[in-house]
Amino acid sequence: MTPLVGAQTTVLSLQNGIDAAERIGKVIGVDHAIGGATWISSALEAPGVIKQMSQFRRIVVGELSGGISPRVETLVEAFRPTGVTIEATDDIRKILWTKFVFISSASSLGSLTRLPMGEYRAVPETRAMIVSLMKEVMAVAHAQGIALDADVVEKSLAFIDASAPHIKAS
């Protein structure tokens, strides 16, 4: 990929996790990488055909170093006509960890139970388990110096509760 990166190239990482953009930056140069988080539910329907499984589609982007740069603003403007809700943040690391509280817990519980969110959210024991998982990830974030909002667990649970019953976390 490095030979394709020019002076004006920007690569946006929308991968789940907390360090994908940093890893990309190590390969192509940190000045070319932008961090991002996305909330979307989709499934591979056939080779090359991706089906959106819900109405939510949100992207948050930001510079790894913090702040909102002109290239982040340009990226946001480029996405606007697509119908995807997109916003810039001056603290992408906080956003990535906030999503990680949700995705790591929901994905782990989905893998363990082999159930969609609608089924495991309704069982008191698995609901308690997801809260415990979220609090553990939140503690790791705090240990890494990331100041997450105090209500991140409650907001993550509200997102799960508002999701269609058949949705699975990736």
Regions flagged by a language model, labelled:
Residues 3-4, 27-32, 47-150, 154:
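Internal alpha-helical scaffold of NAD(P)-dependent oxidoreductase catalytic cores
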Residues 161-170:
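Short, intrinsically disordered, charge-balanced linker/junction segments flanking boundaries
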